[in-house]
């Protein structure tokens, strides 16, 4: 199927202070946005796509000056694709605290004239949703046809249905969870510790030193990447294959250089990530993941937390996702059904682990396509 083609981001400036959950406020901030498709006259065909940890507003298409930079969900969003831009007006928003153009630690603090660095406030999923709602206001969108996201993006979609129940018709939550488990928080803590202990971190103000804590970022990404893959997928891709020089006489080198293909792969992923991502952003986003727990205010009762929701839901999980296992999605489905909400649940048998939500799996995409057909019929009714 064809791509959406060449796209251009736009920066939206907001001067009305945004009150954050931690009690502080951002007086002025920018959000980078990309849109695809056309908003209809009734403004009823808009879909908000929320991004995960290392993604951004660049959901689909390519840039004229960087044709290799394909949108992170290009296989899902575009003409004739499951989220069909011939039918829907799709918005991607880069969240606060990111390193891809929206106001974050790398941005200049107007009160000091220097990058925010470690002084940038800790933000939450709820803060992001409030900021996204202001983007909707700027477009004159009173109600989204759907709010959609995978992983951390799914948490934002769920939060939308709880915080703004009258502003979305459908909520699509893919490979996500209503809260992190202790194990997931532990993975995030180990990743953050690798960054915080890097000598080049300088308390988060490494910009002034002209360095970047690449070693810490590299290890953080390696840890995270392991959790995004399934054991079966890693076995199929790498097994115990060795990275030997051609014609090598010995099976092992008997040192601590790269021996196995899986080691080489993780180091490559870590190096690539450390080149383009920001360490302070990584700390902020993983902490936002940790804090998301809408049931906390209801003594841990997820059913009670969802009492005021009104949306129709599509919840999708993947059998080999052990980061956010299907049991977590089923927990959400049960809580929604307790309120007799209209819920479609798909548990897709896919070998790729958590990252399956980003891949072009036929059963997964057929589910999404069928659901968006239903939404399109409602929009056009």
Curated annotation (Swiss-Prot):
Cellular component terms (Gene Ontology): cytoplasm
Domain spans labelled AB hydrolase-1: 45-360
SUPFAM superfamilies: alpha/beta-Hydrolases
Protein's pathway: Amino-acid biosynthesis; L-methionine biosynthesis via de novo pathway; O-succinyl-L-homoserine from L-homoserine: step 1/1
Gene Ontology MF terms: homoserine O-acetyltransferase activity; homoserine O-succinyltransferase activity
Localisation: Cytoplasm
Reactions listed under catalytic activity: L-homoserine + succinyl-CoA = O-succinyl-L-homoserine + CoA
Keyword tags: Acyltransferase, Amino-acid biosynthesis, Cytoplasm, Methionine biosynthesis, Transferase
Residues that hold substrate according to the record: 221, 355
Database matches in Pfam families: Abhydrolase_1
GO BP annotations listed: homoserine metabolic process; methionine biosynthetic process
Residue positions of the active site: 151, 321, 354
Sites annotated Important for acyl-CoA specificity: 323
EC number of this enzyme: 2.3.1.46
Role summary: Transfers a succinyl group from succinyl-CoA to L-homoserine, forming succinyl-L-homoserine.
Family: Belongs to the AB hydrolase superfamily. MetX family.
Subunit structure: Homodimer.
Protein name per its UniProtKB record: Homoserine O-succinyltransferase
Natural source organism: Paraburkholderia phymatum (strain DSM 17167 / CIP 108236 / LMG 21445 / STM815) (Burkholderia phymatum)
Source lineage: Bacteria, Pseudomonadati, Pseudomonadota, Betaproteobacteria, Burkholderiales
